[in-house]
Amino acid sequence: EAKKYIQKLLALKLNDEAMYVLVRKVGSGVFFKLSADKRYHPEGAELATAALAAAHKQARDPKRIAQLVTELNNPSPSIRALAISDLKEAGYDAVIAMIAALADDNRAAEHDRIANALFLMGEIVIDPLIGCLGSDNPRLKKHAIEILGQLETPQATPYLIYPLFSEASPQSLTVAAAEALQQIVRAVPTESDAQRYLRRRVAQLYDGDLPQQASADGTITLWLWHPEKKLPVPIVHDAQDEALVVAA
């Protein structure tokens, strides 16, 4: 009976949007199980592959993501919560779209709720937000610092030293960096303590103590600020070279 139902669904030739709705309704886990269950082969695997591919594509559609970012400022808490859930599903594509909105001064009225949504998305936002610290946009940097502090992100610690002590930092960034470090390491370092910490951290990097695990092919992805795109972008480095990049 189930196999006949699968055959009927395949015969309908549902478009990507309809497939996405189907996956949202029954859950992606059902399709992963369907793909692995030999009782329903080959139709089950065919349907599962098509449905999951469509869901992946739809979740990351730029127009859909842009609409979800707009919905973060909807007066309805339930609509905002659903938008955050859908943005989480879209992954890094959504994070970058949200950062682009934070960098847009014309959308300043939306910034607080967008920043809160980034915080609620959790770990996935950390590396792109660290990349934002290379921006020349003080408003964006302040939001990034505040979110990293709220997430209590240890790997952000060395990147917060510069805005804390640089004479070029506006007061707002100095205060934000101090508050973030207080949240992360439960203390605000003196300048001499910070210098000792950075020297020690550089030595650790050269000894191979990298901020993240290398992938199977021996590479590591760093998010760095792209001055032309005015966004953080992922850059893949050989793990052996990352110490030089991070230390710089």
Where are each of the predicted segments found?
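Residues within HEAT/ARM-like alpha-solenoid scaffolds
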Residues: 4, 43, 63, 78, ...
